[in-house]
Amino acid sequence: MDQQRIARFTLAGVADAEVSLHPFTTEDGLGLGLTRFRRDDCDDVVLLVHGLTTSSDMFIMPEHTNLATFLLDSGFGEVWTLDYRLSGRYPYNSETQRFTLDDVAHYDFPAALAELRRHIGDRRVHVITHCLGAVSFSMAVFAGTVTGIASLTCNSVAMVPRTPLWSKLKLSYGPPLMEYLVGPCHLDPRYGTAPRLTRGWLLSKAVRPFHRSCDEPACHMLSFMWGGGKPIFSHDKMSPVTHARLPDLFGAANVNYYRHILKMVRAGRAVKYDRRDPRHADLPDDYLENAADVTTPILFLTGDRNHVFTDSNIVCHRLLESLAPGRHELAVLPGYGHQDAFMGADAAADVFPQVLDFLKRKAG
């Protein structure tokens, strides 16, 4: 498929399904939205949750068999995608608010599940998550802000974020440098197309010599924003069409989220960003403090070339299995990195069947 023919934010990647949009608001005043793809009546509903700077688009891409279509074709007759405050479809990541993942776990997911339940009732809900969506949704489950999840799949990272050394340095010094010296409070993979000699354009040019794996400026910026000096996916796993669409599929990232990630990396687990914040007084300081009591079955996915969160999910699986044996599974994906597990050209053959097997075993 010619990437020029793929419209930004298109829903055309999911065929033969009834599509409906369901906006909702959070307790702290943000407008968010769910998209419902319904084909048949079913007892098990699947919710797809993206990561930071991507959006629901990563699950409905038309250039190859996407996850939403795969699940519908495999008998899960109702699939929902969520766009929350981390979504590239919204302006929140490029604004000046200093949101944290506590905000996401406290406000976004409870509101999303309430809206979802309003339409599906008490049917079973299985949640598939990616990147910081996996971290924050896991936080919500372990904090109890969302309940009644039949199964949870987490790609790349979850409750034990770990990064390469270079990433730790960027997490430490990047936010203050961006906010107080370079300029904007966010990083954007589209800086390569910014007006010449602007700060964003200059940053893109400065990054380029260190990322010689391709000629796509957005790919270089994404590697700089998230990779440990290497791309966030294995290039041989990505369709050239998808690679050319990176500026459409990824948006800005507010650097304050990096501060929260750094705090977790240093703590070795998911922790609250600010213990003194009265808004989050009911959230645990340590999200793993009652981990043994969480009964939700979890599948951890990770590529063996994950240059963003390295062995985070391997370590998380080992830790949670020591606390609650038998509730957690791990699948290591040969040749895959961070993003390509869900967005890769052959993910429907290499990755999705493993997720499907887990879902079917946890379904009624």
Q: Can you annotate each of these PLM segments?
A:
Residues R118-D122, L132-K272:
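Alpha/beta-hydrolase-fold enzymes
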Residues H307-I314:
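Conserved alpha/beta-hydrolase "acid-adjacent" motif
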Residues I6-R38:
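N-terminal cap/lid segment of alpha/beta-hydrolase-fold proteins
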Residues R98-H119:
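Alpha/beta-hydrolase active-site loop
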Residues H50, V125-A134, G303:
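Conserved alpha/beta-hydrolase "nucleophile elbow" surrounding the catalytic nucleophile
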Residues R327-G364:
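Catalytic active-site module of serine/aspartate enzymes centered on a nucleophile-bearing elbow/loop
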Residues T26, G33-P91, N313:
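Short, surface-exposed "cap/lid" segments of acyl-processing enzymes
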